[in-house]
Amino acid sequence: MCLVSLSGFCTTQKKYQLKSPDEKLEVNVGIGKNICYSLLHEGNPVIMPSPISMTLADGRVLGKDAKVKRIQRQKIEELIDAPLYKRSQVQNLCNEMILTFKGGFQIYFRAYNEGMAYRFVMTKDKPFEVVNEEATFNLGQERMGYVPFVRGGKGKSMEKQFFNSFENIYTHTQVSEMPSNQIAFTPVVVELDNGKKLCIAESDVNSYPGMFVHAAEGTASLKGVFAPYPKTLKQGGHNNLQMLVTERESYIAKCGGKRSFPWRIAIVSSEDKELLDNDMVYKLAEPSRLEDISWIKPGKVAWEWWNHWGLSGVDFKAGVNNATYKFYIDFAAKHGIEYVILDEGWAVNLKADLFQIIPEIDLEELVGYADSKNVGLILWAGYRAFDRDLEAVCKYYSELGIKGFKVDFMDRDDQPMVDFHYRAAAMAAKYHLMLDFHGSYKPTGLNRTFPNVINFEAVHGLEQLKFASNGKVDQVTYDVTMPFIRMVAGPVDYTQGAMLNSTRKDFRPINEAPMSMGTRCRQLAEYVVFESPLSMLCDSPVHYEREAECTFFITGIPTTWDETVALDGKIGEYIAMARRKGDVWYVGTLSDWKARTLTLDLSFLGEGAWKAEIYKDGVNADRIPADYTRTVIDVPQDRKLFVNMAEGGGCALKIYR
């Protein structure tokens, strides 16, 4: 294949350079007939000269024949408090260059030790419309990438692809072989030379569409794609709970005047494990708008939908009714689980009205019962129903005692839908409600701006195994791929915790009796590996009671952390992650379908005597995935620990003094 280099489209006269604090990363910006940037890491090309611009409806192109008026440089060095994150403080260290242009706009460039970012800023206070944004990532040569194509998007129109749930597995493909008419959501990871990786992401997406990417035909280049602004919508979709776009405008965003635009991010890792522990999306996001966050309580959730309200040995008909939810509340109270969720079914179907409750549910009684047990209730809500009566819903249910909403089926990221996420977050915060966004685009820092947005889906999570076609879904490989890519963007509501575990050959998708792929210990380890401040226990209380030892371990794992250390990992193969809360460490490891032994370096523990409670795959876990052993050992003085994992296996550790 003949590849065309986009660098030929960059005609520059003036050049500006910006280096990272450690000087390993170098950003070069060229200004001439257009504006181009390039990126080097340790002297090696990562992104070749790539044009960037914004085209406005009045015909102006921000970036064409641009003239620099002023250049400003500064070093940013600060610690960001992050009380509901994977570490309690985030270091924000970078060098910044601000180019101010004639015509009323600026471009901010930042060089971090771990990557670079840029954003456009409009300085004129006059309404305008953005027709398109040119965001280019010119790789310069053939590269392999891990690409989350929009599910079902192949051969479809762009419009049909813009309506999607942002849930798919990763395709490992050459960038030049990506169909130019097929889009992928971000983050996307590209393989570089010498084991390095490039991760393309975005942050601070506020009142603007999210960025997809596609391959520029005949090039080794990825280009941004943005959903146009909806012109007309109709109510429909899943149970009449969605707003479907029937026609779009010729522009992607309406803007009121002065504003900043999203950060375009290029993360560079020397080792895969660095992607497991990257903070760029978080630290580039707008700081918190909430002064008081003491009411936001992360934790675990007993969840009924995945296990299909699967109770046995009870004297009532299990389903969407008060008796069933009282059983879940009792289970949560017994095990110190903070919340129980009422998923889809508590409100009258097809009405998109959260004030019409089915007669089998008495919410006031349930809230009182849960409160007496020190358990909070979270309600599922379809997007249209939630947005239509937003303040009335938030006010009423907050006063009733509900702690939050799981809002679902947005399935878009055009500008009005992004606006909804911010509007919902602000209104929920006003009434001290947490939000868990499902059927939503990936996080772009909203959890920093509104910390009450406690989690996001945008993941091919365990729910997919209720319906997956046999042999067509490899969830085990996905589990050791997703954290290097999707989790770079932020927390993930994967909904782990299955107690019915299967081998690859024995897996069956059964809606009312679902199972996981891989071993029991894999499910335990995922509570450590996956960042999830509001973390589901997906299986039935009946199964958890039968597996009391595993349940006790799971319910003791924190959901937010003071420190995170990526110990080891290779994308698509294995992961080892350590996280600390207070003076207790947890370690989780995952493997693909290959049995393997990892040597864990626990030198981060420092001096002193430590014990490790270890849940590891049993000797027969390759045939019986639920087989495991629990041991307690003294951590070796050399701080080296060997971990054996079965095929599709995992290991979970609690390390304490």
Where do the model's predicted regions map?
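Glycan-recognition and catalytic regions of carbohydrate-active enzymes
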Residues: 539-586, 590, 622-626
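Conserved, mostly hydrophobic/aromatic
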Residues: 332, 408, 435, 529, ...
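Bacterial Sec-dependent N-terminal signal peptides
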Residues: 1-14
